[in-house]
Structure formats: structure tokens, C-alpha cells
Amino acid sequence: MNPRSAGGPRGVVPPGSHEPAKRGGSEGGRPPWLNMRLTVVGSSGSIPGPESPASSYLVQAPFQGRTFTLVVDLGPGSLGALYRYLEPREVDAFALSHLHPDHCLDLCAYYVLARYSPTAPWPRQPVYGPRDTAERLSRAYDVPPLEAKDTDPGPTLAGHFDFHDWQATQQIGPFTVTTVPVDHPVEAYAIRITHNVPGGGSLVYSGDTGPCDALGELSQGADLLLVESSFVEQPGNPPGLHLTGKQAAEVGTRAGVGAVVLTHIPPWHDRDAVLAEALPYFPGPLSLAVTGATWEIG
């Protein structure tokens, strides 16, 4: 972590230990915290890296006497890492920023668990994502995209997941989730998650995007901006694809967010160099996403 990690901003408790949290939260399934919590499951950009799976994040909060868990993206390698924090069947819902493999492909592995594990069949979990998510993931696993018509969910992803196209705003458990399209070669969304309690915190996740006004507008006043920083400052970066650390920090400054966390840095870039490029352009707490790090927001 960089020197600005200490002494959290408004509504954000500084990142906790990078050691994996205990699975299942506290006794009875109730979390030992009251606010929304972000945990980094995987943060490697574009591919899994030697120190981290590809993109995946837990967003959790108390809800109806227990912990509600929203998994945001589930890239390659992240399902295995998820076991460090909870039993996978305890996931309440999934949110997919877009359908590039590094953000969604382990949902196919999750399907294997839901269908074949000793505790199967599992309840159908909601999956929120771009149009045709069910069809695209079904093709990836080479199973029929349509739900089976009998009582056995059978070899279909739609038999095990309840797919929803992203709307501008939706309620998911204790969260209001707002999405906007961002600038990427495929249908892609930035996601704002607000905890529905008095004084509840807000988190914005950029997904993958090049510079665009929509991300800044969605991020206005957020407590924490989890923002991709795939590029370094150099000539020839292609437009409409990714952000540099500097550009990510500038989004946070213009939007007046409380803290910035840089993520989605590919293994071929020096993470510390990306951080160094960003530091001069954001005046508040700024850090790198590290597997196992947590932030309390609210």
C-alpha cells in the first residue's frame, strides 16, 4: 500500500489485512461490521496473474439478520479464491460488468459446482449482466442456452442462474445498483452500488473502459472509486479501451470521490509504476487493489 492508505476519508475505513478473511463471517452468518464492505478476490488485468486471479470483488452488507453477498465479476481463477471468504453456495447474486472472459468465465465453473457438488442442486442465483449473458456463457460451456422444461434444471445455465439484463437502476438485496454504459469494444458497464441504510456508503466500479464522461458522472460524490488502470502513460495507447493510472486518478478528482483504488493492472506492467503515475493527480487516499484487501464503506 502507498502512504496515502492511512487515515481513511469520509465514509471509508482504510484497507484491512491482506490475509484472507474467515469464511462465513461471524457466528450465525451475521457480519461483524455494520457498513458495506468491499473485498478484493481478484484484481489482475486481462489475464490471471502470478499473485492474483482475474477480476472479482465481494460487496457485502448486513441484510435481514445475515450477510448479503454480491459478487461483482468472476474472472478466471477467482472461484477458487472465493473459498477463502465464504462457501460459494452462500453467494446471493452476481453482477457482470461485461462479457470479456477475464470478467465472467468462472461463472461456468460455478455452474459445475451448482450442478455436481455433493450439496447440489443449489438455489438459482440471480445474474445481472449485459444482453445475451445467458446465451454467451452457455456457448462458452457448450450447453443449451434455454432453461429445461421439466423439474430437473439439467444441462443448462439458465436452469441454475436467473439471468437479468442490466437496467439503469435495480434493487439487489440491501443495495441500489445503478449502471451506465462505458467506452469499451463490447457492451460494458460501470456499476454504482449504494447501501440502502441511513448514511449508507457508495462504491463505484469502473469495469473496463477508456476515458468517458459517463464514468465521471456516475462517480460523483462516491465514497470509493474502484477503477481500472490497465495502461501506463505512453504513446500509442489505443482509444476506447482502458485507462492509465493518471486518467483513473483524474476521474476520482473531478468526481470528488473519497478514495481511489486502482485495479485491473495486467501482469506485464509494473504495478508500482502505475501507482506512481496516479499519485500526483488525486489528493486523497489512493491505493492498489490487492487480493484479500477489504474496505468498509459507509
Model-found features: residue ranges?
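N-terminal non-cleavable signal-anchor helices
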Residues: 13-14, 222
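Cap/insert and terminal regions of metallo-dependent hydrolase folds
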Residues: 211-296
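Binuclear metal-dependent hydrolase catalytic cores
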Residues: 27-205, 210, 215-217, 275-298
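Intrinsic disorder/low-complexity segments enriched in small, polar and charged residues
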Residues: 2-13, 27-28
